[in-house]
Amino acid sequence: MITWPAPQVPSIPGALTSVRVMDTSSGQLVETVRPGVGESSMYVCGITPYDATHIGHAATYIAFDLLYRAWLDAGQRVVYTSNVTDVDDPLLERATATGVDWTELATSQITLFFDDMSALGVLPPHTYLSAVESVPMVISATRHLLESGRAYRVPVPAQERPVHSPAYDIYADVTSDPDFGSISGYTSEERVRLFTDRGGDPATPGKKNPIDPIMWKAQREGEPGWDGDDLGWGRPGWHIECTTIAHCGIGRSCTVQGGGSDLIFPHHEMSSAHARALFGQDAGASVHAHAGLIAYQGEKMSKSKGNLVFVSRLRQEGVDPMAIRLAILANHYRDEWEWTSDVLDAGIKRHQLWLQAMSTNGGPHPGATLAAMREALSNDLDAPRALDAVDAWAYATLAGNDEDPGAPGVVSRAVNALLGIRL
């Protein structure tokens, strides 16, 4: 799938030498720029396109865009892969409820997502595949796990109206992975609760374990399906979709797997277990990094609650996308925080401050500002401290310190390259 256009990343003096990121599984800051290794790779889980991009989505993709930019500044070759789950239960349910063909709904929302990402200055993935495009890979992976005894069939009862008979859903057996649970560290009770709350089916008759994830869902009446040969007609499960797409774009292992903190379990736990089952116990990500969830009107922003703030709507109202990005960057990517009008107003004011300072004929020498930005970003992508460094430079500039006539240009390029803020 072709992504949105890549924004230009300008060259700036100096370079990062270290980029440490918090690893969820260990609870430690982990170095992601390895000595003698000129490449860093990242898989970030994509959207299910049944609604427009909200601020929570934007915050996650901006967080990992910071990591991408930090790696580039460190001289790394970056390999970035992502997905879009363009066939899944929530999408099909929304299409049915609105009377829109599911493919048209997915296409329209993917287009809007691309427009939002482009406007926000997010660097696109090199490999961007959809669930539909992953079908042949998922069939192969599911067959492999069946043959190795790590997956099993569960008959679909007639009351669920399977299109073909006999029909089987295929599940992965989580107990076949000795390292299952190593990412989240949750108890058995917590796993079942989260699996249930986040769309799982713990009570399905015939499952070996309540939290076994579906790999291949047999086609039901009114739903799309693909010919899986010996697997029967069906469609991919979410977790195996990401596993196969990550392997296609990056290989058996990557530097970072990223997403929102609501993906720690079951999604990242399951997709990592699939990777180990398919490619060996040392397969998967070296670091699992997670962005905090954003609240609105007192509750976590979610499609099910409907308490969403859409990027496209803010843009339609005339808000500069760079002000939106600045409002998001004012909070550390791992923090949970609430979107309010005051948060947006602060982003707008900061954007205006920076524009005013960058339009002057000189400013303080930029060396200390760039060093402070890099020091902040090297320590778990601390964007708020990087913003503070630019604020200090801007206030000094507007106070009349114009010692270096080239400073505004250098700082402008730096906030573009490191923070993704085009001025």
UniProtKB/Swiss-Prot annotation:
Short sequence motif named 'HIGH' region, residue ranges: 47-57
Catalysis performed (reactions): 1D-myo-inositol 2-amino-2-deoxy-alpha-D-glucopyranoside + L-cysteine + ATP = 1D-myo-inositol 2-(L-cysteinylamino)-2-deoxy-alpha-D-glucopyranoside + AMP + diphosphate + H(+)
Single GO term (MF): cysteine-tRNA ligase activity
Enzyme class (EC, first level): ligase
Cofactor: Zn(2+)
EC numbers for this chain: 6.3.1.13
NCBIfam families with a match to the protein in the record: mycothiol_MshC (TIGR03447)
Subunit structure: Monomer.
Family label: Belongs to the class-I aminoacyl-tRNA synthetase family. MshC subfamily.
The protein's name in its UniProt record: L-cysteine:1D-myo-inositol 2-amino-2-deoxy-alpha-D-glucopyranoside ligase
Protein species of origin: Jonesia denitrificans (strain ATCC 14870 / DSM 20603 / BCRC 15368 / CIP 55.134 / JCM 11481 / NBRC 15587 / NCTC 10816 / Prevot 55134)
Gene that this polypeptide is encoded by: mshC
